[in-house]
């Protein structure tokens, strides 16, 4: 079987589509931890918009700190259900 070569953009789009499929199953009761990148995909916004504007809003859910071996390289994580709830209540264009 031949291997298929994809451009980096095509590969990223496939990965994002798979992530969106997984994220679309989240509910307000979801306890999964998600990243800012996941949140950007979930809301269909650019990462920078989520990281610099949306996540800084005073009523946006606060990140939780996962226990990791290397705390310095730890990215903030958010409880998915809190983010879903926030999105339902605060649905407006940012």
Swiss-Prot record:
In its UniProt entry, the species of origin is given as Haemophilus influenzae (strain ATCC 51907 / DSM 11121 / KW20 / Rd)
Indicate what this protein is called per its UniProt record.
Uncharacterized protein HI_1423
Q: Domain of life of the organism in this record?
A: Bacteria
């Amino acid at each position: 079987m031949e291997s298929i070569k994809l451009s980096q953009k095509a590969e990223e789009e496939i990965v994002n589509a798979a992530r969106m499929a997984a994220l679309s199953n989240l509910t307000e009761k979801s306890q999964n931890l998600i990243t800012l990148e996941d949140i950007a995909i979930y809301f269909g916004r650019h990462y920078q918009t989520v990281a610099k504007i949306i996540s800084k809003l005073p009523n946006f859910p606060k990140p939780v700190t996962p226990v990791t071996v290397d705390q310095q390289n730890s990215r903030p994580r958010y409880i998915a259900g809190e983010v879903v709830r926030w999105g339902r209540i605060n649905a407006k264009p940012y």
